[in-house]
UniProtKB/Swiss-Prot annotation:
Key words of the record: Ribonucleoprotein, Ribosomal protein, RNA-binding, rRNA-binding
Protein name (Swiss-Prot/TrEMBL): Large ribosomal subunit protein uL4
Molecular functions per Gene Ontology: rRNA binding; structural constituent of ribosome
Cellular component GO terms, alphabetical: ribonucleoprotein complex; ribosome
Pfam family name, one: Ribosomal_L4
Function: One of the primary rRNA binding proteins, this protein initially binds near the 5'-end of the 23S rRNA. It is important during the early stages of 50S assembly. It makes multiple contacts with different domains of the 23S rRNA in the assembled 50S subunit and ribosome. Forms part of the polypeptide exit tunnel.
InterPro entries: Ribosomal_uL4, Ribosomal_uL4-like, Ribosomal_uL4_dom_sf
PANTHER family according to UniProt: 50S RIBOSOMAL PROTEIN L4 (PTHR10746), LARGE RIBOSOMAL SUBUNIT PROTEIN UL4M (PTHR10746:SF6)
Family listed: Belongs to the universal ribosomal protein uL4 family.
Organism: Polynucleobacter asymbioticus (strain DSM 18221 / CIP 109841 / QLW-P1DMWA-1)
Length: 206
């Protein structure tokens, strides 16, 4: 599989050979969907909470007597039927949203995503990607000069300059091969991978 080399001025240069085992797989939409949804579900922190009738602060006094008023019987104002009462099935911070995806399936999903990105021309290779100073403007100008808008940059090792410069650009993300995730790969319009990172990705996903 040949991946196009992207120059600093935005032109495409000679191709770079990549493993067909990783970058030339058939696209499996169902598997990719499962892997992305599982990744998002596992990232949920469970930070929502509601109160049931036991936790709501209300008096336990019976609102009115059981019989003789003509009104429907009522036990206490914390009933879920009442305004301001507890929830019948409240959400809890202890809820478990995690979904299990086997390592084999996860790797297959990642290979499928990378292969589809390569087919669509959204995956390009660079010799290396580095900055001389930790300046956001320097990175923004470099990305713009390459004709990129929304981009995920995968490098062998993220330097401090690159990390600091990318923090304030919401359409630019930087990571190392072992930290690349399926959501980021499908979320950004373009993916830039350094030559050294290509070798690492192939090693991780074979």
């Amino acid at each position: 599989m040949e991946l196009k080399l992207l120059q600093d001025n935005g032109t495409l240069g000679a191709g770079v050979q990549a493993s067909p085992e990783v970058f030339e797989r058939e696209y499996n939409e169902a598997l990719v969907h499962q892997v992305v949804v599982a990744y998002q579900a596992n990232a949920r922190s469970g930070n929502r909470a509601q109160k049931d009738r036991e936790q709501v602060k209300h008096t336990t006094k019976k609102p009115w007597r059981q019989k003789g008023t003509g009104r429907a019987r009522a036990g206490m104002s914390s009933s879920p039927l009442w305004r301001g009462g507890g929830r019948i099935f409240p959400n809890s911070p202890e809820e478990n949203f995690s979904q299990k995806v086997n390592k084999k399936m996860y790797r297959a999903g990642m290979r499928s995503i990378l292969s589809q990105l390569a087919r669509e021309g959204r995956l390009n290779v660079v010799d290396q990607f580095s900055l001389d100073a930790p300046k956001t403007k320097v990175l923004a100008d470099k990305v713009k000069a390459m004709g990129l808008d929304s981009v995920l940059i995968i490098v062998d090792q993220v330097s401090e300059n690159l990390y600091l410069a990318s923090r304030n650009l919401h359409k630019v993300a930087v990571c190392e091969p072992q930290h690349a995730d399926p959501l980021a790969l499908v979320q950004y319009k373009k993916v830039l991978v350094s030559k050294a990172a290509i070798a690492k990705i192939e090693e991780l996903l074979k």
